[in-house]
Swiss-Prot record:
Transmembrane segments: none annotated. HAMAP family: SecB. InterPro entries: SecB, SecB-like_sf. Disulfide bonds: none annotated. Homotetramer, a dimer of dimers. One homotetramer interacts with 1 SecA dimer. It comes from Marinomonas sp. (strain MWYL1). Gene3D superfamilies: SecB-like. One of its GO terms (biological process) is protein folding. This is Protein-export protein SecB. Keywords: Chaperone, Cytoplasm, Protein transport, Translocation, Transport. One of its GO terms (cellular component) is cytoplasm.
Length: 159
């Protein structure tokens, strides 16, 4: 086998090898609201935490995908909103060599799970800057959420 043929074969195998790497993490948007400040600081603090998650993804280049993890945290105290934090944590991921199902799973579960610690840290930082006690969100099983989402989609299409 010639050197050229070996090189082409190696390049073909490399192109088919699944690859997923994070190129960049960025904060796309962040918002903090504390509608009852400063009166809220005079009340006994018994927070009720509400959490909403959403993910978006889109292809932005050859094998390059933007994934955005959107998190909204609403904290109520005695039934009134103490604060609201909205974060859009973005990431650029280079993904190749995956079939459509694997790609969908990577974009819907793996990439958001990778972004979550960054979003959690940004949420915690802004809450503390708002003069509230630190909030450390518990880890989230994005694989389970992804499977649940698929099951809902399948149930809707069979109806």
């Amino acid at each position: 086998m010639s050197d050229t043929a070996e090189t082409q074969e190696a390049q073909t195998q490399e192109a088919q090898t699944p690859q997923l790497s994070m190129q960049r993490v960025f904060l796309k948007d962040i918002s903090f609201e504390s509608p009852r400040s400063p009166m809220i600081f005079q009340e006994e603090w018994k927070p009720e935490v509400g959490l909403e998650l959403n993910t978006k993804s889109r292809q932005v280049g050859e094998n390059v995908y933007e994934v955005v993890l959107e998190i909204t945290v609403t904290v109520k105290n005695n039934g009134n909103t103490g604060y609201l934090v909205q974060v859009q944590q973005g990431g650029l991921f280079v993904i190749s060599g995956l079939d459509d199902q694997q790609l969908h799973h990577a974009l819907g579960a793996f990439c958001p799970a990778t972004l979550f610690p960054y979003a959690r840290e940004n949420i915690d930082a802004v809450v503390v800057k708002g003069s509230f006690p630190a909030i450390m969100l518990a880890p989230i099983n994005f694989d389970a959420l992804y499977i649940e989402s698929l099951q809902k989609q399948q149930a809707e299409t069979t109806q």
